C-alpha cells in the first residue's frame, strides 16, 4: 500500500488548509482501512469530530490563527534555546472539543485482565460499546512510535475498532522542542503498521502544521515530564 496519497479526506484537507487555524499539511493518511468499519456511520462521525477538533487549535489562544515564534528563547538557566516552543498546549483545545462531543478523556476501553495496559488514551469515543481511540502526539519520536504501537495493539486485541493519531509536520521541527515526534520519522514505518492483522478496523493519521511564523507572538510554553521538556 502506497502512502504518498492515502485517505479519502482530500476535500477535508483543502478546507482546513486555508481556514486560518492549525493546518493539515497533507491529506489524511489511512494506515489501516479494512472491512466494513471504515464505511460505517460510527467512523464517519468520529472523523468529523476529530477534524473539527483539529480545526479548534490556534496560537495564541483565541486569535483564530496558529502562529509560531521562530526566535530563539531562553532556558531557565539563561542559555539560548534554539528549540523555543513547547507542544503540549497545542492539543488542549482539540481535547476540549472532543469532550464537548461526548468523548471521554484520559480513558481506556474495557480490557481483559490478560491484555497489557499501555497508559490512558488522550480521548475515547464510545458508540454503544464500539470504541475509537484518539492520541495527539506531544512527545519525542520514541513517544510517537509508542503511541502508534498502542493504537495498533488496541486494534489487534479488539479493544478498539478505530484510532486516530495527530502528529506534527516536518516544517515545525525547527521551532519546537528538540526531537519532537513528526511525520517524517514515522512515515518509513507506515507499511509495518498497515500490515497488522485486523479484519475490520480503521487507523488514520492527521499531519498538523502552523499557519505562519511571527516573532510578534509569545512562544508556546514548555512543560516538564521528568527531565524532558515538551
Task: Report each predicted region and the residues it spans.
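N-terminal localization/anchoring segments of enzymes in phospholipid and broader phosphate metabolism
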Residues: 3, 9, 15-21, 46, ...
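Acidic-basic catalytic patches of nuclease active cores, encompassing PD-(D/E)XK
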Residues: 30-112
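Structural motif
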Residues: 130-132, 162
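Domain-level recognition of nuclease-like catalytic cores that cleave nucleotide substrates
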Residues: 170-230
Amino acid at each position: 500500500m502506497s502512502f504518498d496519497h492515502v485517505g479519502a479526506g482530500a476535500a477535508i484537507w483543502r478546507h482546513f488548509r486555508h481556514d486560518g487555524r492549525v493546518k493539515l499539511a497533507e491529506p489524511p493518511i489511512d494506515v489501516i482501512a479494512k472491512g466494513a468499519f471504515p464505511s460505517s456511520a460510527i467512523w464517519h462521525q468520529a472523523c468529523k469530530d476529530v477534524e473539527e477538533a483539529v480545526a479548534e487549535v490556534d496560537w495564541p489562544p483565541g486569535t483564530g490563527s496558529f502562529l509560531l515564534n521562530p526566535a530563539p528563547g531562553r532556558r531557565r538557566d539563561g542559555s539560548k534555546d534554539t528549540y523555543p516552543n513547547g507542544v503540549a498546549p497545542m492539543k488542549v483545545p482539540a481535547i476540549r472539543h472532543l469532550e464537548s462531543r461526548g468523548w471521554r478523556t484520559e480513558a481506556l476501553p474495557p480490557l481483559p485482565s490478560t491484555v497489557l495496559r499501555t497508559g490512558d488514551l488522550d480521548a475515547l469515543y464510545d458508540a454503544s460499546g464500539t470504541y475509537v481511540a484518539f492520541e495527539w502526539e506531544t512527545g519525542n519520536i520514541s513517544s510517537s512510535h509508542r503511541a502508534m504501537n498502542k493504537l495498533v495493539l488496541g486494534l489487534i486485541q479488539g479493544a478498539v475498532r478505530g484510532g486516530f493519531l495527530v502528529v506534527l509536520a516536518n516544517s515545525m521541527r525547527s521551532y519546537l522542542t528538540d526531537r519532537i515526534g513528526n511525520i517524517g520519522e514515522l512515515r518509513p514505518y507506515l507499511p509495518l503498521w498497515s500490515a497488522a492483522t485486523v479484519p475490520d478496523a480503521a487507523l488514520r493519521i492527521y499531519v498538523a502544521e502552523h499557519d505562519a511564523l511571527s516573532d510578534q507572538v509569545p512562544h508556546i510554553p514548555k512543560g516538564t515530564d521528568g527531565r524532558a521538556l515538551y
